[in-house]
């Protein structure tokens, strides 16, 4: 789950940030983040929705290993939402469950920002 080779950041940090962003997208439907993190998290969200479409015990366990609880929802709530709402919603779609929309640069450090949202 690492998205860039960022000096000063460990693999564990990159993995946790990616897992948290994936959980936030499933919880809220969209997030605002940097373009690089959005592109990487997009891969993982699309993969989780593909697992939700399969709806097997193995796919539920694989998704549970990735999802983290947020302030509003527990990991179990997110798993239910993924398999009961998002899986059936995208059942007839072959892929491309999310989109990244560029927002421009952040005022503080001039980093490109983007919105990662479910289609």
Curated annotation (Swiss-Prot):
Source species, domain of life: Bacteria
The keyword RNA-binding belongs to this UniProt entry's keyword annotation: no
Gene Ontology biological-process annotations: translation
GO MF, one example: structural constituent of ribosome
GO cellular component term of the entry, any: cytosolic large ribosomal subunit
Cross-referenced InterPro entries: Ribosomal_bL17, Ribosomal_bL17_CS, Ribosomal_bL17_sf
Subunit (UniProt): Part of the 50S ribosomal subunit. Contacts protein L32.
Name used for this protein in its record: Large ribosomal subunit protein bL17
Species of provenance: Ureaplasma parvum serovar 3 (strain ATCC 700970)
